[in-house]
Structures are given as structure tokens and as C-alpha cells.
Amino acid sequence: MDIDEESYLNAGPSAPSKIPQGGEGDRLQGMSKKAMKRAAKQARLEEIKPLKRAAERERRRQRTAQLAEGYAAGTLSEADKELVERRRRVEKERKEAQRRIESGDQANDWLGGVVIDLGFDDLMTDQEIASMAQQLGYLYSSNRTAEKPVRTVIHTTFSPAASPRLWQRMENFNWHKWSRCHWWEQGLETLKSQLDPSTSILSVQSVVSKETQDKAGIDTKSLLSRLTGPQVPVDLQAGKHKLVYLSADAEDELLSLSEDEIYIIGGIVDRNRHKNLCQGKAEQLGIRTARLPIGTFLEMLPTRKVLTVNQVFDILVKYLHLGDWAAAFEAVIPIRKYAPGRKTKRAKTETKRNEKEEEEVECTSAEGEEDIGVIEESAEVDPEDVFSNQ
């Protein structure tokens, strides 16, 4: 299925998209011509998304069949052969991890906790919201195949009312099937009070706000039943587990990870626009802050100064497995890719391309869309396909 996207997006008044009626329509009517044109183009883009995704899925199926046939016949290039074998290895690890969960064999799980603070929906652009959703998918995939996975990952401030744009994005990711993950409409302040033995309630029912229920449609109401806050997961105990907000602006350095602590990662993509955001929030809530001991490594990266949410999480789980911060950081972002001799524009472009391909292949493979296959560099990662299981 081929889609002439450019022609469709630039279509004139005859295009099927219409300015909506009611409140949204009134808002658009007050816009300038340029703003209205931009809004109409965005509406047309939303219309063709299902078509693009269907076309991409078909292209992937064809590519997967070609790879399977070529692998069996021994006619693949070395690069394609390596990618196929890597994907098989990751798929094998995924199945083994799933087997352990289903059999109740979680003895190797790390019994501390990680919180993703999603209380920044209003500070991100739509593009950043999309990136945040993708990062949450990568994070889940990493944890599910980790040598020592985190038993409890809580996502706070997540609902149609608390984080409307992220909620909408995440509908395509089947988040409610993710193992070891807990989702709260309530914010970080509620979690803090629940872990405080002087204020926490031993038995509390999951509560979804009336505002959220009023906004919910039929499908959304079924998803709302998967929100578990403010019930603290059974492996975390009030009075025992302490919160630690990870912030690059913190004075204290995190020397090791403790199963008596819950580490908070700020769920925001802001390209470093908002200075001291997480540090300030933690101080306001009275939560201890600490920074990862990787400052010397960050200084060696000429093109990367801000770590993504999934990269921070990956460093944590790699440290849990390796017991060494330097080895953990090197495993997540290899320093060799940023050697002084490779600081040319071409080298940087190649590095970014390779990292993107590696991430997409690993992420897709971990979810087992097919037995053999790769996501090519030009392919758009479809969350509906990539994160469809568990």
C-alpha cells in the first residue's frame, strides 16, 4: 500500500478534513490563516496514520519473510545475518523471562523499586509526549529481558485527567499488559504519604477521580480499572522503603543501589529547557535527591549531555547485574562511539543511525512480533506492533 503523504497533507479545501464544531471549532475560527492551515494539516496527518501503520506492517511482514527465506538459504549479507541472529537471541531471552514470570520463578528480581514520575504532561510538546511514550516502551522491554529485573515499576500521574496527551499516546502500547508495572492516577506526593508509616493506610482501595471517570468512554473505563493507585505494591513497605529522586542537579552522589530504596526518574523530555525541575520538585516534597556517579562519563560525550528516561533505567538495571557503574554506563552508551577521532559530522550521523537501528531491533525483538526479522533504519516504529504482548 503506497501513500502519497505529501500530496495528501498539502491538499486544498477539497480535502476531507473539516474544522470541528463546538468549542474546538470556535477556537480554530479565532486563529490566523496560517495557524488554521497548520491545524488542518495536522488533522489530515491524523487521518492517514492508520493507513501508514497498515502499510508499514505489511512492509515489515514482507521484509520478515524475505529474511527468513534468505537466512534458510544462506544468502543474506553479513549485516542482515547478524541482525537476524541477534533478534533470535533476544527473542529467546524474552521467552525465558516470560516463562519465569508465568511459573512464579522471580527469585532473581531486585526487590527495590523504580518510579517514573509522569507529572510533567503540560510541560512537553506533542512531539516530546510521543518520545516519552516510546521511552516507556523501551524501559519496559529492557526490564522484561534484564538479567536482574526490577520487581516493581510504578508510573505516577497517569490518567486521562492527570496526563491527557500521554494517556492518549499510550493507548496504542497496551500498557495494561506490561508485567512488573503499576500505574497510578495519583502523583508522587500520594506515594510519599503512603510510604510514611505515620500517614499511610494499611488497606486502601484503588481510587480513580470523578473527573477522570466523567471523561472516560467505554473503552477508557476498562483501562481505568487497571490503575492501581494509591495501593502500594505488596513488595514495597511503609516505613522500610525510602524515596530517592534521581537528579543531575543533586549534590549527593549515588554510590550503590539499595533494596530498601525506591528510585524516582523524572518522566520528561524537555531537551534541558527546564533547569532544576526534578530537583526543585523533590525539594518541595521533602524527598532526598541523588545523582548517578557518571559525571566523568558524560563529559566524554560530545553529542549527548541529557540521558533519556530509558537510558537512566538501563544504567540502573545494568548496575544491578554488573555491580560496577563504569561497566553499566559503557553497556548502555559505549564510549568508543564517541572517540575523538570520530567527531566528524559523518561519524556522528553514522553513530546516531546505528544506535537507532540497534534500539529498534532490540525493542521489537523483545516483544516477539515475528520469529525472524529486523526493523530497517527508515521504518517508523509502530507502538501497536512493537509493544503488543504482555
From Swiss-Prot:
Compositionally biased residues, Basic and acidic residues: 43-59, 347-356
Enzyme Commission identifier(s): 2.1.1.221
Biased composition (Acidic residues): 357-390
CDD domains: SPOUT_Trm10-like
Classification via InterPro entries: MT_TRM10-typ, MT_TRM10-typ_sf, tRNA_m1G_MeTrfase_euk, tRNA_MeTrfase_TRMD/TRM10
Disordered, as annotated region: 1-72, 343-390
Localization, UniProt: Cytoplasm; Nucleus
Function of the molecule: S-adenosyl-L-methionine-dependent guanine N(1)-methyltransferase that catalyzes the formation of N(1)-methylguanine at position 9 (m1G9) in cytoplasmic tRNA.
Protein name: tRNA (guanine(9)-N1)-methyltransferase
Organism: Cryptococcus neoformans var. neoformans serotype D (strain JEC21 / ATCC MYA-565) (Filobasidiella neoformans)
